[in-house]
Design a protein with these regions (language model features):
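A phosphate-binding glycine/aspartate-rich beta-alpha loop in the early core of alpha/beta enzymes
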Residues: 76, 224-287
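Short glycine-rich phosphate-binding loop at a beta-alpha junction
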Residues: 217-218, 451-462
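Short, well-ordered amphipathic alpha-helical segments that serve as non-catalytic structural scaffolds
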Residues: 435-447
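Intrinsically disordered, low-complexity, mixed-charge
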Residues: 1-177, 181-188
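Gly/Thr-rich phosphate-binding beta-strand-loop-beta motif of the actin/hexokinase/Hsp70
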Residues: 397-420
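Short beta-strand scaffold segments in enzyme catalytic cores
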Residues: 227, 282-284, 368-372, 411-416
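Internal gly/pro-rich beta-alpha loop/helix module
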Residues: 322-396
Length: 463
């Protein structure tokens, strides 16, 4: 019997990696432990060398859906550390932060089933998630990715949620945003005067009814608010353009599912694959010749930005909606996407009629990603929700910590340290005080994530 210490780096926190390791060890009858630290995941195995090799092979070939393994370091320990079983230990702190933050991900099929299953205690719950889906980047304060370090820290688990959270064989084991209507954040519908109209599923149903009747709503998404209205209603789409002072720029449309998109557009297999991916980005596709949604959504062009409902709240909303919805980032011109109801009321009270909110704070804003398929390849026009933060491995190791800032337009920041390159989500044009503040806040956020103080700062020379 030997002992092996395995260090795994990459997107390995908040993606069900520890329970995956636990169940893999149980399957192979291996004793030891697994834990998180601020570099990634550590695994100790008590087993024969061939058993360790088989374990690592399966770890590499079949990791959790949302995981991305960048490196595996294996060390044979001469002093054997005997373990009586395999356990999941508490997170530790190494003072060397390099773990990769997972992007937010769209709701998985299992959670969609949960919110539509009348026998499930999460039936109709708009903030359902598990280790395979839901918010990550948008709710995290710092690493390691534990509940105490997220905007869910103030919500204490009820008995039902705690059972799942503490069961290593459950897909919600240590899913940090896990909650239900009893113990978690809830959805509330407000009018523009900040008066509460409805809560929970009644709020969702009423919001859908208001959209069907031609009103404009601000609806909280994963990384910020959307401005939403009926995509088939010329009058309300035109009113939104007037309210936002956006006469011609195309809007995106959110659909219930891929079949709904096919009703209005001509999509190829690659576009369908991207639309249905776990990231659920906006994809630019060709309109059908008899395109029957409002011509004011994307005037004078033959393409439209489409995306599929990606949160449980969206899916519940489409239960009651009659048509696809126009969904665009809630912001003023040249300002970042809005994260809070109070900011919507302060800045967009003349734009929206109602607000559908929930009380899980968005700590880090993140727009929708935008993709165009060119020669069967995904070209990212906006790298954001689902894809960012983006981690890349450098071919060479840098001995300097480098912060790259880009230029004034379409701004994004990146950090380079060791052999890691971390790209932030899309920030946007830096033409307002608010966008510059967002830019500076993003820099401070990423510095905090990685205990990063740059040795070198670089930017584009042009303005």
């Amino acid at each position: 019997m030997k002992s092996f210490l395995i260090q795994v780096s990459g997107i390995v926190q908040g993606v069900g990696f520890r329970p995956f390791v636990y169940n893999l060890a149980i399957k192979h009858n291996i004793k030891g432990w697994v834990n998180n630290d601020d570099r990634g995941v550590n695994i100790l195995l008590n087993c024969k060398e061939q058993e360790a090799q088989n374990f690592i092979k399966e770890l590499q070939e079949n990791p959790p859906v949302l995981a991305k393994i960048n490196s595996i370091n294996i060390e044979k320990i001469t002093e054997i550390k005997e373990c009586k079983s395999f356990e999941i230990k508490q997170s530790s702190n190494s003072n060397n932060k390099s773990t990769i933050i997972s992007p937010d991900m769209s709701i998985c099929n299992d959670c969609i089933e949960d919110i539509n299953d009348m026998s499930n205690f999460r039936y109709n719950y708009s903030l359902t998630n598990c280790t395979n889906c839901g918010p990550r980047y948008s709710i995290i304060k710092t690493v390691p990715y534990d509940r105490v370090n997220t905007s869910m820290s103030s919500f204490m688990l009820c008995e039902n949620c705690a059972k799942e959270y503490n069961n290593p064989t459950n897909r919600r084991y240590h899913a940090q945003p896990v909650s239900c209507e009893v113990c978690g954040p809830n959805v509330t519908l407000y009018n523009k005067y900040n008066e509460i109209l409805e809560s929970n599923i009644n709020a969702v149903e009423k919001a859908a009814d208001l959209i069907n009747k031609g009103f404009i709503l601000a609806i909280k998404g994963m990384g910020g608010f959307h401005l939403v209205c009926d995509a088939s209603n010329d009058k309300v789409v035109n009113q939104l353009r007037i309210n936002k002072n956006r006469p011609n720029k195309p809007y995106a449309v959110m659909f219930k599912d891929i079949n709904s998109i096919k009703t209005y557009t001509k999509i190829n297999l690659k576009e369908e694959e991207t639309l249905c991916s776990k990231e659920k980005p906006i994809v630019l596709v060709k309109k059908k010749d008899d395109f029957s949604l409002s011509k004011l959504i994307a005037p004078n062009i033959n393409q439209i930005g489409c995306f599929i409902a990606y949160t449980p709240l969206h899916h519940l909303l489409f239960r009651y909606l009659k048509n696809p919805i126009l969904a665009t980032s809630a912001n003023l011109k040249d300002e970042p996407i809005i994260r809070s109801k109070d900011e919507v009321l302060n800045k967009l009270s003349l734009v929206v009629d109602y607000i559908l909110d929930f009380n899980r704070d968005i700590l880090n804003a993140c727009d929708d990603s935008v993709i165009q398929i060119v020669e069967n390849c995904n070209i990212k026009l906006r790298n954001a929700r689902g894809y960012a933060p983006t981690s890349l491995k450098l071919e060479k190791t840098t001995n300097k910590k480098i912060l790259a800032l880009g230029a004034n337009q379409k701004s994004t920041i990146s950090l380079a340290f060791e052999n890691n390159l971390i790209l932030s989500p899309h920030i946007g044009d830096l033409n307002s005080i608010e966008s510059v503040e967002y830019f500076e806040r993003t820099i401070e956020t990423f510095k905090r994530f990685y205990d990063f103080e740059p040795d070198i700062i670089v930017c584009d020379k042009h303005p």
